[in-house]
Amino acid sequence: MTAASRANPYSIVSSEEDGLHLVTMSGANGFGNGKVHTRRRCRNRFVKKNGQCNIEFANMDEKSQRYLADMFTTCVDIRWRYMLLIFSLAFLASWLLFGIIFWVIAVAHGDLEPAEGRGRTPCVLQVHGFMAAFLFSIETQTTIGYGLRCVTEECPVAVFMVVAQSIVGCIIDSFMIGAIMAKMARPKKRAQTLLFSHNAVVALRDGKLCLMWRVGNLRKSHIVEAHVRAQLIKPRVTEEGEYIPLDQIDIDVGFDKGLDRIFLVSPITILHEIDEASPLFGISRQDLETDDFEIVVILEGMVEATAMTTQARSSYLANEILWGHRFEPVLFEEKNQYKIDYSHFHKTYEVPSTPRCSAKDLVENKFLLPSANSFCYENELAFLSRDEEDEVATDRDGRSPQPEHDFDRLQASSAALERPYRRESEI
């Protein structure tokens, strides 16, 4: 038996690609993770950037019957054009059905005969053919009431059909109005104004490597009880040899400490601490360039106007995670309020001091981390903003500005810190 014939038919790689699997070995510097890195196999997204799930259902038994059994949900989920077409056809069908019934009643009662040979009152006045019966059906169901045609007491069947058509018309109207209102008020449309950053970043936060991404709300109306979740999705082979194409692993974003619940008034950076329980614990910057996984991020909450739960989704592939970057500030204090500049929402800047090793190596080998007092890009913006406010205040008072005391003090403090890398603002 050849190697090709022994290949697993359910494997995600071919027999030619089987040799590209990662093998373990010790690193040359003793701090490696024991992997030889090969090219990354391109994978399809499970969740698209706009939140849609990249799936297609196939070979579903009795799909039409199951969808028709839940007609209301089907009408809400389908496109507007199809929903309006369905209701238009429903109205036409009911008008035609009752028009035919009124026409049959008129024929059976002899109302279509000439007036000279007819010696009794017709069931429906002014109905002399099918077109007149159809118009009477429309007038009855829509309560137009032109006054030319009306049912008489001559035929109880005609009276009963008028009552039945009125009930059917109310049912169709109620169903249509309910479906349209439910479709217009769907909370998933609220997700269009909830924003995720284009990239996620990995950087140090309080001395620990953290995975971070940013979320924002483009409306002034709040998302009540907003909370976030995240999952890492990647293929996995169990110890028994079972292949799981999309294994879902929860990523902790502070559930135990309540950090997953956010007050989403301004853009917030969501934080996942890469610790021993994290699926990213053994991933370094080099691994990130070759690994194959997807991180699905979910934001849930209630719409303030309707109290209905909405959910916004996005995802980050491994090549969309920037190692050693931080997000640029978007919140600035301006006069008596705070200003949010969304032009910086997706922008990041590089932090050269970020370790390139994994969090596991960082813990085990205890790499030296930069001082907590190191000069930071956000700190520089804060100092510059304060200097501008001081200049404006002194110009307004008509006094000459003081010497650049704060800036000199800043230069003196920053010069005392010997850094082997460039300042973040110079990147």
Swiss-Prot record:
One of its GO terms (biological process) is potassium ion transport. One of its GO terms (molecular function) is inward rectifier potassium channel activity. SUPFAM superfamilies: E set domains, Voltage-gated potassium channels. K(+) 2 binds at T143, I144. K(+) 3 binds at I144, G145. It is a multi-pass membrane protein. Highest level in cerebellum. It catalyses: K(+)(in) = K(+)(out). Residues 1-77, 184-427 are cytoplasmic. InterPro entries: Ig_E-set, IRK_C, K_chnl_inward-rec_Kir, K_chnl_inward-rec_Kir2.2, K_chnl_inward-rec_Kir_cyto, K_chnl_inward-rec_Kir_N, Kir_TM. The modification S-nitrosocysteine is found at C75. Activated by phosphatidylinositol 4,5-biphosphate (PtdIns(4,5)P2). PtdIns(4,5)P2 binding to the cytoplasmic side of the channel triggers a conformation change leading to channel opening. Inhibited by Ba(2+). GO terms for cellular component: membrane; monoatomic ion channel complex; T-tubule. A motif (Selectivity filter) lies at residues 143-148. K(+) 1 binds at T143. It comes from the Eukaryota. Keywords: Cell membrane, Disulfide bond, Ion channel, Ion transport, Membrane, Metal-binding, Potassium, Potassium transport, S-nitrosylation, Transmembrane, Transmembrane helix, Transport, Voltage-gated channel. Disulfide bonds join C123-C155. Inward rectifying potassium channel that probably participates in controlling the resting membrane potential in electrically excitable cells. It probably participates in establishing action potential waveform and excitability of neuronal and muscle tissues. Inward rectifier potassium channels are characterized by a greater tendency to allow potassium to flow into the cell rather than out of it. Their voltage dependence is regulated by the concentration of extracellular potassium; as external potassium is raised, the voltage range of the channel opening shifts to more positive voltages. Belongs to the inward rectifier-type potassium channel (TC 1.A.2.1) family. KCNJ12 subfamily. Homotetramer. Forms heteromer with KCNJ4. Can form heteromeric channels with Kir2.6/KCNJ18. Association, via its PDZ-recognition domain, with LIN7A, LIN7B, LIN7C, DLG1, CASK and APBA1 plays a key role in its localization and trafficking. This is ATP-sensitive inward rectifier potassium channel 12. It comes from Mus musculus (Mouse). The lineage of its organism: Eukaryota, Metazoa, Chordata, Craniata, Vertebrata. The gene is Kcnj12.
